[in-house]
């Protein structure tokens, strides 16, 4: 089976049974189709099983990968689908490129307005609400409002009263001089309802139901009860499309197994037009990691600042405000909080997919290690041991080792190391110390040696490890280095005396195994480092300076990166990031003692 088909098959197994939208992409990573589904897994699987018509067969033949976004309802999926189609204009979405395919409810712009269901939007002729998933949904909503409000029904004003007046569904403006303020109040209540504010209409119906019941008019009370239930069933909170046109970005995140996923929803003109997904290996607490991310998001990544930024309530608003120069909102309830929760839920789904795909791929690990051995020109590495260091500015340096046997993690043979002999942030010396300690003990206790050692790093790390193994311990074990790109993703495997790149295809099983190993050793190392920091506390020269607490210390480290950079900074540099002048002077003096 071709590699892309295998990847698609693997990913289909971890798609959730939830509503949402999906994006099909071709070999050039272009979006060629956008769709929605009540159950994402079932819909996506249907594309890759069974027979299809000619158009769908052509579409499936071009698909090389897919993405999906989870929503809270089928209606949200529709609204998001429309926004995504407008954004990407996929060539296979011919039938969905125009909003006219979907019905809207319209309040006409007349002296005595009418309620209409229409598929044509003409600006200046009235207010439009929607779109609705289908005509039935729009018609049911209109019928409900017709039963509650005696709005005008006739297209042209007749000369005499019609049936609607006699059954109480029209005030008869064709004959009577209807109070315009009363009509305007009805229009306001209908508008509020169509914008998702159903509390007013529900309260009114509940009062009518109670009055009818007290008057022993049980038939009328039952009718009001049925209307209330109908509204509750029909009303579907539409978080993806809002009548609020404020430009805002919505942030949500999830943390698991040493990784953090942050999702950003870009809301423009009430629509979610785009999202951004970022995976980050946790180096600090989740809160500190988020502050660092959001500060860089609008500076390094040059995203345009919106009018509002919405973030979870567990975060420190002042910390975020110090690095993001716009209004920070932490919604406590309602649709805005729902949107933050939805971003967090999508982040959780993304993390789950990452880990589930890893676990499902364990059945192919034997092939992976065979392929790895062939490409490196060594015997099949049955036992692989991988190392990674973790520290912040040289504080509490630690290292960790993970063991993979037959391409699968062997957790009982994982090891943790506190760096003992190295002062300051020196990755090379730290790696030499840990390798020396590990394999001295292996030799002394007669433990099994690995077939391959992998270090998280490049040529410098590899040479240091090889020197310790060969010249100090007399061991000849293959040593390889794994490097990452600027997105923290495994990018290349280095091997040999000159640390040459091993020609592995990025979509090969061997490369994916290396990605798993690097992720796992990194997770294990930073988890151990966080545990160590929690016990000892993060100590630095900043701890002894008056006016510098944890928040300002984090702000300084995030802004300057190191004590050395702070010593090079001016008073103005400190003031520019929000440090008060008196504290900045004290800080400057202490750093230059």
Curated annotation (Swiss-Prot):
Database matches in Gene3D superfamilies: 5' to 3' exonuclease, C-terminal subdomain (1.10.150.20), GIY-YIG endonuclease (3.40.1440.10), UVR domain (4.10.860.10), UvrC, RNAse H endonuclease domain (3.30.420.340)
SMART domains: GIYc
GO cellular component: cytoplasm; excinuclease repair complex
A GO molecular function held by the record: excinuclease ABC activity
Keyword Disulfide bond listed: no
InterPro entries found in the cross-reference section: GIY-YIG_endonuc (IPR000305), GIY-YIG_endonuc_sf (IPR035901), GIY-YIG_UvrC_Cho (IPR047296), RuvA_2-like (IPR010994), UVR_dom (IPR001943), UVR_dom_sf (IPR036876), UvrABC_protein_C (IPR050066), UvrC (IPR004791)
GO biological process, one term: nucleotide-excision repair
The keyword Ion transport belongs to this UniProt entry's keyword annotation: no
Location within or outside the cell: Cytoplasm
PROSITE patterns recorded: GIY_YIG, UVR, UVRC
The entry's keywords: Cytoplasm, DNA damage, DNA excision, DNA repair, Excision nuclease, SOS response
Principal cellular location given in the protein's record: cytoplasm
Residues covered by the GIY-YIG domain: 17-94
Residue ranges annotated for the UVR domain, each copy included: 199-234
Subunit and interaction comment: Interacts with UvrB in an incision complex.
Family: Belongs to the UvrC family.
Function field: The UvrABC repair system catalyzes the recognition and processing of DNA lesions. UvrC both incises the 5' and 3' sides of the lesion. The N-terminal half is responsible for the 3' incision and the C-terminal half is responsible for the 5' incision.
Database matches in PANTHER family: UVRABC SYSTEM PROTEIN C, UVRC/OXIDOREDUCTASE
This protein's name: UvrABC system protein C
Organism: Staphylococcus aureus (strain MSSA476)
Gene name linked to the record: uvrC
